[in-house]
Swiss-Prot record:
The protein's name: Period circadian protein
The protein's assembly and partners: Forms a heterodimer with timeless (TIM); the complex then translocates into the nucleus.
One term under GO cellular component: nucleus
Effect in UniProt of substituting G107D: In strain: A28
Effect recorded for G207V: In strain: C2
Higher taxonomy: Eukaryota, Metazoa, Ecdysozoa, Arthropoda, Hexapoda
PTM statement from Swiss-Prot or TrEMBL: Phosphorylated with a circadian rhythmicity, probably by the double-time protein (dbt). Phosphorylation could be implicated in the stability of per monomer and in the formation of heterodimer per-tim.
Effect of I201S: In strain: O11, ABM, A28 and C2
Length: 396
């Protein structure tokens, strides 16, 4: 039987029915049709049990044998009918007179057992009634067993769900959950990088034209933060200088002050930057999420120096964008006597020339040209582009 349809009583009790039937040896035919070899004591005891079978059809199958010892073979399947069980099964019918004892088991019927009493049919009504009662009982037990198994399954499922809830999806586990390294843009993992970029990149070795101007710093704080000693070949005007090459420093020495390599911070270039009040902020996120790198305007000389791309220090996620910022001529350092309009080239070295800035360049130097932060301007060509033309193309 399937789990959906409850099994019938006959299916549940099939083996017990077979054992009970063959062990009880019932008589279902009249005595006249019995074979003559049947003993009289067996017939009389069977008739007496037929009379007692009005109480329950089970008692009709009990007490087979004239010796008086009633063999109760159905105790296992009739536990709930113990109150109806005939208690006087021990009969005295050994004389063959048909007196097999009175049926005082609660039914009140006296089994006279005379030879003229017709046998009671056991198969149609009484056995059907008994089967119905037993079927209800067995179905109840079956439902209880199924209910217990269902509760066990539910408990196990609930425990599994609770274990999943308690364990929880940790960092890096599960689908659709942000991994542990992906919060570096907004978490604390990016702060040390910003601090290193904002503080340690100072002037790296003096001697450059306007060397020592710190990269990616607030221009208004240049007087205080440019005193940091820069890293080797990183600072402005250093050995591998980013802006304003040609310095004689090794990248390790010098305070990186604006102007001369070791002079004080009193050069007019700094005053020009501080007075111009460029729209810069101090807290600049150099690694913004999902962006092409946005850089701040760096210090460019009055001769509009264009820096080759290969001279940039490897800053991750920074796009090589160039800015032209007009500035006054800083003639304090030794190398600034000859202004050198450096032109962008494929090689890392910078061509120095002794050309003087033309009148157009001087006019462009005085133009009030400012660039907005966060806006990417077009890349200059390999040939020299005049700042006025570059500004015109940028404004378009």
């Amino acid at each position: 039987s399937s789990t959906e349809t409850p099994p019938s009583y006959n299916q549940l009790n099939y083996n017990e029915n077979l054992l009970r039937f063959f062990n009880s040896k019932p008589v279902t035919a009249p005595v006249e049709l019995d074979p003559p070899k049947v003993e009289s004591s067996y017939v009389s005891s069977a008739r007496g049990e037929d009379a007692r079978s009005t109480l329950s059809p089970v008692q009709g199958f009990e007490g087979s044998g004239g010796s008086g010892s009633s063999g109760n073979f159905t105790t296992g399947s009739n536990l709930h009918m113990s109150s109806v069980t005939n208690t006087s099964n021990a009969g005295t019918g050994t004389s063959g007179t048909g007196n097999s004892g009175d049926g005082g088991g609660g039914g009140g019927a006296n089994g006279t057992g005379s030879g003229a009493a017709p046998p009671v049919t056991l198969t149609e009504s009484l056995l059907n009634k008994h089967n119905d009662e037993m079927e209800k009982f067995m179905l109840k037990k079956h439902r209880e067993s199924r209910g217990r198994s269902g509760e066990k399954n539910k408990k196990s499922a609930n425990e599994a769900m609770k274990m999943l809830e308690y364990s929880g999806p940790g960092p890096g586990h599960g689908h659709g959950i942000k991994r542990g390294g992906s919060h570096s843009w907004e978490g604390e993992a990016n702060k040390p990088k910003q601090q290193l970029t904002l503080n340690t990149i100072g002037g790296g070795g003096g001697g450059g034209v306007g060397g020592g101007m710190p990269l990616f710093l607030d221009i208004t704080h240049a007087s205080s933060s440019s005193q940091n000693k820069g890293l080797a070949g990183v600072g402005v005007g250093g050995a591998g200088g980013v802006v304003g090459g040609g310095g004689s420093g090794t990248g390790l020495g010098g305070n990186g002050n604006v102007g001369s390599g070791n002079g004080n911070n009193n050069q007019p270039s700094t005053n020009q930057y501080t007075q111009s009040r460029l729209p810069c902020t101090q807290n600049i996120n150099l690694w913004p999420p999902f962006s092409v790198g946005i850089t701040t305007p760096t210090s460019v000389l009055s001769s509009h120096t264009a820096v080759p791309p290969s001279s940039f220090s490897p800053q991750h996620s920074l796009f090589p964008t160039f800015y032209y910022i007009p500035a006054s001529i800083a003639a304090s350092s030794p190398s600034s006597t000859n202004t050198n309009p450096n032109r962008p080239h494929k090689h890392a070295h910078v061509h120095n020339s002794s050309e003087k800035p033309s009148t157009s360049q001087a006019a462009a130097a005085t133009m009030p040209l400012q660039y907005m932060t966060g806006v990417m301007y077009p890349h200059p060509s390999l040939f020299y582009t005049h700042p006025a033309a570059a500004a015109a193309t940028a404004m378009v």
